[in-house]
């Protein structure tokens, strides 16, 4: 039986497979788990077309395999960022584009709900993959933007 892969690219090795290379494959899987547990990445969004995010099986670095995605670029119109139908995960999405336009995070096909991220705002989005034809994405808007506090204080 050959290896199979999860929607986020983690390799599920078959019993007895990959003699001599399973350690490397396991390390790659652990890196993918680390990325999705708390990894950050910036994703450029172009003005001329929508952006498609994907995952390469057994590879690290895919935008979708990160918990926090910051959208960058200069926009003159709202743009869509699409994901594959089988992705089921939650993300922190920040629209850091210039031009005061929305970024819409949605599944590649179907008429399910999407996550609209207003310029300068951050949302928590849960991609449900709840319907193979019209999957939905639920969102929670944050009251304020996420910032890096380099001077935390206790009891004050």
Model-predicted segments: where are they?
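N-terminal hydrophobic or amphipathic segments with adjacent small-residue motifs
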Residues: 10, 17, 114, 149-150
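Extracellular disulfide-bonded cysteine-rich modules/repeats
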Residues: 21-28, 50, 119-131, 151
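Beta-strand-rich solenoidal segments
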Residues: 79, 87-89, 101-142
């Amino acid at each position: 039986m050959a290896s199979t892969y999860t929607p986020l690219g983690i390799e599920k090795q078959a019993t007895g497979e990959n003699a001599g290379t399973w350690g490397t494959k396991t390390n790659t899987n652990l890196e993918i788990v680390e990325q999705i547990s708390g990894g950050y990445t910036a994703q450029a969004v172009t003005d001329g077309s929508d952006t498609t995010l994907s995952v390469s099986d057994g590879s690290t670095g895919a935008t979708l395999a990160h918990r926090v995605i910051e959208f960058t670029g200069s926009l003159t119109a709202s743009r869509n960022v699409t994901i594959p139908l089988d992705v089921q995960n939650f993300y922190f999405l920040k629209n850091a584009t210039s031009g005061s336009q929305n970024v819409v995070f949605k599944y590649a096909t179907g008429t399910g709900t999407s996550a609209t991220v207003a310029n300068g705002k951050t949302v928590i989005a849960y991609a449900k993959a709840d319907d193979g034809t019209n999957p939905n994405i639920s969102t929670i808007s944050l009251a304020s933007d996420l910032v890096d506090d380099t001077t935390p204080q206790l009891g004050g």
